[in-house]
Amino acid sequence: MTARGYCPMIKWFLIGLLMSIHMIRASWVDPDTPEYYKTTKPMYREDKRQYELVFSDEFEQDGRTFKNGDDPRWTAINKNDYTNEALHFYSHDNARTMKGYLNISTTQQINGYRAFNEKTKKFYADKKYIQSAMLQSWNKFCFTGGIVEFSARLPGKPDVGGLWPALWLLGNLARATYVGSSDYVWPYSYNKCDPRKRVSQEINACSSVNHYGMAPFTGRGAPEIDIIEAMQGEKEKLPSTNITRPYQSCSLQVAPGVERDRPILGLPPKQGHWYSGMEYNNDNATRSELNPFFYGVTLVHTPKAYTYQADALSANVGLNASFYTRQHTYRVEWDPPDEDGIGGYIRWYTNGVFVYSIKGEDLNITGSEIPSEAMYVIMNTAVASSWGFPVPCPSGCTCECFECGNPDCECALPSGYCDNFPAAFEIDYVRIYQAKNEPKHTLGCSPERKPTALFIEGHQKRYMEGGDRRPLEPIRQGGAFCTKTADCGGKRHGICSDRGFCICHDNYTGPMCLAHAGFYENESISENTIEFGWANIYFPKSFVALIILLAIGFLVSLLETVRRHGRHQRYQKLGGPPVDLHVHKMPTSYQNSSDYALPPKQKVVTYCVIDGRLVDQ
């Protein structure tokens, strides 16, 4: 083949390139959001600013999936949950859109694990019997300051304990359930140099170095704002409160915490030994009160100097049965402090009614601050023996097994627990607003004042499971198998090619072209963040391999053609016969290795996924 003969190949190569690559252009606002909801007014009367929509997901498109790499907004994790005495495994198969809602299903499903016992230092086979889902916008969409509103129907039955639905925000430096990323980072919101505390805060204000783009002498962390954690169970009088189950908990979790004379669980705190100034709703019909059942956790480490206290400033408000049968709204209004750490507030509302508020000055007892970190959104249903299960453990019961249908476990389960499955947590929308011309309100996961990108890049294993190639896979734009265009979202979203795979139109992405693409219109980006101009382009692996093979073949054949042409001319001058040369291509080889990222040492049992065949059935 002569060089001229490659023109048709190059032509078809360019056509294929144009068909396979699409610049993904869209804002984070879902086109399905009605125009009326593009702006909102704050419910806090002292806030006179105008707010505009910066992010939304209406979940109108049925069939969306959230496996790592499937969706630009959300990642449904696929891993065991190490935290909070969890009884569930998180699977991306338990999250999808249907009938105009995001459906997070919680089902009975056996998952086998190779567990590690920190006391005996030995591995053993273990199982979990519940499967659920958690969706995160971690390192995809983050924001600092603004208004977040959800509409959701809670899962299960209001009078049956065990399910733990939650809608919450977390600082981008920690990835929820990846315990290696949260240790010494969660839930710090502290920017003072305290020599006694610096060893337990990884990025502290005593440090003069600015590794990973961090500013020197600046404390960083991953605080948590819980918009709703719903507690179901039998309606009975609870100690130290007039609130009964079911109820909603609204919390700010920060560190460092109160170290001495801490409140006793189930009792109100002593005056002067806990935070003060928080505002509650005193209306009898919608009354909210301090949550006496959760004041935070102690994160125990060795040596003792590394142990630290995390505090939860939490309030409860009662719910009725309608929260489990139809949609209700949950809102938080969050204003970060000024650059000096002073001020700021968080205010919670349910169905437009005030529930609870925390101001910056309410945190003075420890010196922590209202969060100013870029935070991401989390939606999940957990099942944990620490949430809604019998406390204390009933007499004569070991409370060590929680399997439905096993007579030995029945005593440890809440009444009616096994009838809760399957349960559906249905979310109608997520909408996030920010104030116009407010410099404290920024978009992006690695903003200029509080960057995260280089730190995450430098500690990737903390944000990964064993076998992962990277924390987040690039978003697939098309490529799913199809038989008709309807399989690819219809003509508006994409087409089904003659070869039987989806090709997405601009502004749509995901393997079946079902998700609206997204990008930041006014992103705050750290100068230390390395950006690549084509970051929003996805190259399928098969396409990359094809390009490499075509390029190698083109170069080899072109060089051989030139060589043969030169030899042919020399032989003609010498009167020799023409030469027929053949090129033999040697196969290339590659190695794909990955390291297993074990969670840090804890005083709890931690797990890693193994082949189910290794677990006795």
For the regions a language model picked out, list residue spans one by one.
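Polybasic, lysine/arginine-rich low-complexity segments
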Residues: 585, 601-603
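Proline-rich intrinsically disordered regions
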Residues: 596-598
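GH16 jelly-roll
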Residues: 25-580, 587-590, 607-617
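Cleavable N-terminal signal peptides of Sec/SRP-targeted secreted and luminal proteins
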Residues: 8-25
